[in-house]
Structure formats: C-alpha cells, structure tokens
C-alpha cells in the first residue's frame, strides 16, 4: 500500500516503510507514530509503503519483490532517506542499502537521533552518545553516514567502498569512545547517587511522574511549582513535542501543612523504546525505582491512551518499578467533553494540567497516599522540652495547640515513626 504526502519545504524527505505481521494491536497507529518521530527529527514525510507478511524477511525485512517497489517509489517522491518501523539487523541495513542505494534508518536510530537533538545537560548528552554508539557499533558496514550523527563526525550512511582497515579503525575509535563515556558517566552517576541519598535521608517522600511521551508530565510539575513554590526559575521545559524532557528534574513541593514531597519529572516512554536507551539512561530512570509513589500522567484525549498505558506498564516492569504504588492522572480531560473537572476518585483524577484545573486536588491525592501511615495523636510536651515541640511544629501537621501550666498540648497528624519516637509525651 502506498500513500504520498505533498510538502512545500525543502528539508530532508523521508519515505516510511512498515511490515504488518499482525503482532501490533494497531499497525496504522504505529506508522502514524513513526511519522511523528520523523517530524520530530525535522524531516518531511513524503510517502508511506506497507506490506502484510506473516513474518519479516530475514535478509531485507520486507519481501524481495517489495524492495524494488520501495526503490522505485522513493525515486518518484524524491525521498532522501528511507525509515523502517522496526529495529533492523546490520545485515538487513547493508542489504537494503546495496539494493536501493539510499540511506536506511530504522525506528531505533530515529529515536536516538531525537534524543540527541533534545539532550541539554551533560549527563543526557553522555547517555545519548553512549546509546547511539553502542547501537551503531555492529552496524558499521555500509553505515558510515551514521557517523555524521555522532557529535562532530562526518560521513555518509550511503557511502560505499570503505575497506576493512577503515572499518576496523572506525570500530576501534567507537569502542574507545564508549569506554571514555562510561567513565565520565560513572562520575556523573556518583553525583546523582549522592543527591538521591541526601533526599532519602531527609525522610521526605519521593513522587515520580511517569507516562507516555507528551502526556503532560512537565506541565503537571510546572503547575505544582507555580502553585506551591512560586519560583519561575524552578520550572522545566514544557512543549507540545515528543521527548521535550530528557533530564530528570526534582522539585521540592510544600503545600504548607508540613507534608512536603519531592516531585520528579522523568523522560517519557514510547512504543518500542530502544532497550539501549533504557540501559544508557539507567541512572536517570533509577529515580523511578526509588519513588514512594508513581503518578502516571495519561493523555486522556488520545484515542490510544489505553495502549500507551500498557507501554508504560511494560517499561516500568523492565525498570523494576512495577510494584510501586501508583495513582493515575487522566490529563487533557477538558478535550473529552467532561464538564465537571477535576473529578477525583480513590486512585485517579481527571483534570487539565495546562489550565491548572485539578492541581490542588492532585496534591491532596498524592499526600493522602504518601502520608497514609500518618496518625492523629495528642502530645503533652513539658516546656523544658522545647526542642520536641519545635520538631513537631516543623515536621507534623498541627491540628490544635494550647498552653497549660504543665506544658504544651499539641494535637498533630504525624508519621508513625515520630509517634513512636516521642511516645513518652503522648497524652493519654
């Protein structure tokens, strides 16, 4: 099947190719998402070719007859590059490039390229470069243009005729660079570990925002910051684009009742997220593993939101975070003809983060989960134990207080550990 798009701009022109083996729940949606990825990589999609097969061709991924059709159609629509909706093996890339005589990309390379464009911090850049080089290493033959996609390198994926010495030199350079990157990442990861340890020692719960890319996680964090922090400098990049956020950002949220929490914004997930990226970003994604609560942000206006939730579930399982308690934020509900927002239930909330509708209720829902073990109790604290009273003032929610001759009566909502620690002052 063919589809052709007419475009005006003169950017890199991409022809998309996919094979429907029946394994995907919604193959058309997968191809649509591939187009979005290409556009996110600043390409123009000029055409689409799909093929139904029981299984992919080991040599060419598509059928041998389809290869000639792809070559012909690529020339017709003046494509500069061909993108396949799956990870291709090194031999498949080599065979396709030999047969079609055009640069060949797969979905994994495309996602890696987007990550490279979006990476801002030193850690993100190191992680992305590591993932790209590790993916490139076994695909060197016939892929020299891929070297141009590594910082500062040049070449052409379609270049041919390079000898074995050149390939071996390239391989050694890449292996050496990967070794250097891993050493640099170890230093950065140690810093992250120190910061995480400091947060854990504070006993303040950690809440991680997770979910599909572009679901609104950064918008939720920014609205929380605006309402409870009030410092615009603490906001993160918020754009309607795939993978706008690659860095893990942590913000301290204090709603004024001595029930603070750390809110963590994380990189978004996507269907067929490359395993190499998950591995390269493990130190960043580890923040999810250490969370006391996960807040899955869902684009409720997307018809495929259930499939996106399943992708999120599978990715969390792969990260070892599948058993962490979770609440569900059905974001962009204002686009779904829901008149009464926010709508709060036991483990979920329907809201519109971009309008700030439901932020207060979400904060309350979060606190009800992470402080579920808190207890209401009354202490009688002697005046000479002022440090105990000060501790309660700073670390518990004060429900009532009054001063009598024998000391300070404090009725508080506090952590059970604090109740046990100061049980000698409990008022019977």
Label each region the model flagged.
Residues 11, 149-275:
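Conserved G1/Walker A P-loop phosphate-binding module
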Residues 21-25, 57-60, 118-122, 165-166, ...:
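Flexible beta-alpha connector loops of hexameric P-loop NTPases
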Residues 4-6, 30-32, 55-71, 247-248, ...:
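Switch II of P-loop NTPase G domains
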Residues 33-39, 71-74, 88-101, 257-259, ...:
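Conserved C-terminal guanine-recognition region of P-loop GTPase G domains, centered on the G4
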């Amino acid at each position: 099947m063919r589809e052709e798009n007419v475009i005006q701009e003169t950017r890199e022109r991409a022809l998309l190719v996919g094979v429907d083996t029946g394994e995907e729940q919604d193959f058309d949606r997968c191809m649509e998402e591939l187009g979005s990825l290409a556009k996110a990589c600043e390409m123009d999609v000029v055409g689409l070719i799909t093929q139904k097969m029981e299984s992919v061709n080991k040599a060419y991924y598509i059928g041998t007859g389809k290869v000639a059709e792809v070559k012909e159609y690529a020339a017709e629509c003046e494509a500069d590059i061909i993108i396949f909706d799956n990870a291709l093996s090194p031999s498949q890339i080599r065979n396709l490039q030999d047969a079609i005589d055009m640069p060949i990309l797969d979905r994994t390379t495309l996602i890696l390229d987007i990550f490279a464009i979006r990476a801002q911090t030193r850690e993100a850049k190191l992680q992305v470069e590591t993932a790209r080089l590790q993916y490139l290493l076994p695909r060197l033959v016939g892929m020299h243009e891929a070297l141009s996609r590594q910082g500062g390198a040049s070449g052409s994926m379609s270049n041919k005729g390079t000898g074995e010495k050149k390939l071996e030199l390239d391989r050694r350079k890449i292996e050496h660079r990967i070794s250097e990157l891993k050493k640099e990442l170890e230093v950065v990861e140690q810093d992250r570990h120190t910061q995480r340890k400091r947060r854990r020692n504070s006993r303040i719960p950690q809440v991680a925002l997770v979910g599909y890319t572009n679901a609104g996680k950064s918008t939720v964090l920014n609205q929380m910051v605006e309402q409870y922090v009030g410092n615009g400098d603490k906001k993160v990049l918020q754009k309607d684009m795939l993978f706008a956020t690659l860095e893990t950002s942590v913000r301290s949220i204090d709603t004024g009742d001595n029930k603070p929490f750390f809110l963590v914004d994380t990189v978004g997930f996507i269907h067929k997220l490359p395993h190499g990226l998950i591995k390269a970003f493990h130190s960043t994604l580890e923040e999810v593993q250490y969370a006391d609560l996960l807040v899955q942000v869902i684009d409720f206006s997307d018809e495929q939101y259930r499939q996106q939730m399943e992708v999120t579930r599978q990715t969390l399982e792969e990260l070892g975070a599948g058993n962490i308690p979770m609440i569900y934020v059905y974001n962009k509900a204002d686009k779904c003809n829901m008149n009464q927002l926010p709508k709060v239930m036991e483990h979920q909330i329907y809201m519109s983060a971009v309008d700030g509708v439901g932020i207060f209720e979400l904060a309350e829902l979060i606190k009800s989960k992470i402080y579920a073990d808190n207890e209401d109790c009354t202490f009688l604290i002697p005046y000479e134990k002022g440090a105990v009273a000060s501790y309660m003032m700073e670390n518990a929610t004060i429900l009532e207080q009054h001063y009598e001759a024998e000391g300070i009566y404090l009725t508080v909502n506090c952590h059970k550990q604090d109740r046990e620690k100061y049980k000698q002052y409990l008022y019977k």
